[in-house]
From Swiss-Prot:
Induction: Constitutively expressed. Residues 1-21, 68-78, 125-144 are cytoplasmic. This is Mercuric transport protein MerC. Monomer. Keywords: Cell inner membrane, Cell membrane, Membrane, Mercuric resistance, Mercury, Metal-binding, Transmembrane, Transmembrane helix, Transport. Residues 43-46, 100-103 are periplasmic. Involved in mercuric ion uptake.
């Protein structure tokens, strides 16, 4: 994964998590953590964060993960990196558009945040390396 893609991925993840810190009505556990670290002033922009910023940052993280696949060609890493942003998007849209129960939407959103955070830590500890050439993978000769 290139340095630009990794930076954009981290920006998307941090933006989604910090955005959830401002939403006391939607995500009380994240908002209480945000208030504890001094981000309580963000609550005045709760509507902006829930309607726009969280979906934008989660989409940025998802697109950066999908773009990273073109450089490392590891479908397992791409799949794990995509689960978190997709869950966060389903949770936030389920809450704002009322197609999910409020408690279920929160659980899905929090699960997405945790998965995004854990995959981000994993990516920092064990960065992706290219497994295949861009034109395809060579298969080993069969053993006789």
């Amino acid at each position: 994964m290139s340095a630009i893609t990794r930076i954009i991925d981290k920006i998307g993840i941090v933006g989604t998590i910090v955005g959830s810190f401002s939403c006391a009505m939607c995500f009380p556990a994240a908002a209480s953590l945000g208030a504890a670290i001094g981000l309580g002033f963000l609550s005045q922009w709760e509507g902006l964060f829930v309607q726009w910023l969280i979906p934008i940052f989660a989409s940025v993280a998802l697109l950066a993960t999908l773009a990273g696949w073109f450089s490392h060609r590891q479908w397992q890493r791409t799949l794990l990196g995509s689960i978190g942003p997709v869950l966060a998007l389903v949770g936030v849209f389920g809450l704002t558009h009322h197609f999910l129960d409020k408690d279920l939407a929160r659980v899905i959103f929090y699960t997405g945040l945790v998965v995004m955070f854990l995959v981000s830590i994993w990516d920092m500890v064990n960065p992706a390396n290219r497994r295949c050439a861009t034109d395809g993978c060579e298969t080993p000769a069969p053993r006789s």
